[in-house]
């Protein structure tokens, strides 16, 4: 069935895993203590700091919260509060021109082609929605955010949970079988397939030197880049 909507992951799918791990994560980790000290009383920041403090045992100093968050970065923990605070820190970095977001070279032309043909694009990433908008807005291919019709993060649910995709289907208001989900993570594709979505495994050699074929792909159609996605 021809998809009517594209839903895409970011890290490892549109963009290199190494950019996130080697540029964005270290930038946020280094900036966290000063950012918390400077902005900790702002309501949006306070909300997330308090959420972390509650999780680690109640009232505690912001410096301890910052250390905890740095530890979560080291563990690559997908925590909503961490993602939100990282997004606020990355906002400053993008706007100062400290970096631009990496996109694989074929992605922007393909996304523009889909947009021109009237195929809506949605993003679902473990990064917060504000961070996603920055990623697309300050990309090395220019501002790609106008190509995106909607954004989803882990506030709608975990990416390896079928119910998350069911909620996305309800939000988009298109039958699940007419939505194509793109990701580099087989377990995410499994969850999307369970919810009725079409799937493609993005298996980039830069990120996965050993091709994931056969059982490793778990029945998902495999492509190595966006140009190979046949619609």
UniProtKB/Swiss-Prot annotation:
The gene is mtnC. Monomer. Its cofactor is Mg(2+). It is an enzyme of class 3 (hydrolase). Its EC number is 3.1.3.77. SUPFAM superfamilies: HAD-like. This is Enolase-phosphatase E1. Binds 1 Mg(2+) ion per subunit. Bifunctional enzyme that catalyzes the enolization of 2,3-diketo-5-methylthiopentyl-1-phosphate (DK-MTP-1-P) into the intermediate 2-hydroxy-3-keto-5-methylthiopentenyl-1-phosphate (HK-MTPenyl-1-P), which is then dephosphorylated to form the acireductone 1,2-dihydroxy-3-keto-5-methylthiopentene (DHK-MTPene). Keywords: Amino-acid biosynthesis, Hydrolase, Magnesium, Metal-binding, Methionine biosynthesis.
């Amino acid at each position: 069935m021809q998809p009517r909507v594209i839903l895409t992951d970011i890290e490892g799918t549109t963009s290199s895993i190494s950019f996130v791990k080697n540029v964005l994560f270290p930038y946020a980790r280094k900036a966290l203590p000063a950012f918390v000290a400077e902005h900790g009383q702002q309501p949006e920041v306070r909300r997330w700091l308090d959420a972390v403090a509650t999780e680690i045992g109640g009232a505690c100093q912001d410096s301890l919260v910052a250390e905890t968050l740095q530890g979560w970065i080291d563990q690559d923990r997908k925590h909503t509060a961490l993602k939100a605070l990282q997004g606020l820190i990355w906002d400053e970095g993008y706007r100062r021109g400290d970096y631009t977001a990496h996109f694989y070279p074929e992605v922007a032309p393909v996304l523009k082609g889909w947009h021109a043909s009237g195929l809506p694009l949605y993003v679902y990433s473990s990064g917060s929605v504000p961070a996603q908008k920055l990623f697309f807005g300050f990309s090395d291919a220019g501002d790609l955010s106008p190509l995106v019709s909607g954004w989803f993060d882990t506030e709608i649910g975990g990416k390896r949970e079928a119910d998350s995709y069911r909620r996305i289907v309800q939000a988009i208001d298109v039958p699940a079988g007419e939505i194509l989900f793109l990701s580099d993570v087989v377990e995410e594709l499994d969850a999307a397939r369970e919810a009725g979505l079409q799937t493609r495994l993005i298996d980039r050699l830069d990120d996965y030197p050993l091709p994931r074929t056969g059982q490793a792909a778990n029945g998902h159609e495999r492509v190595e880049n966006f140009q190979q996605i046949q619609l």
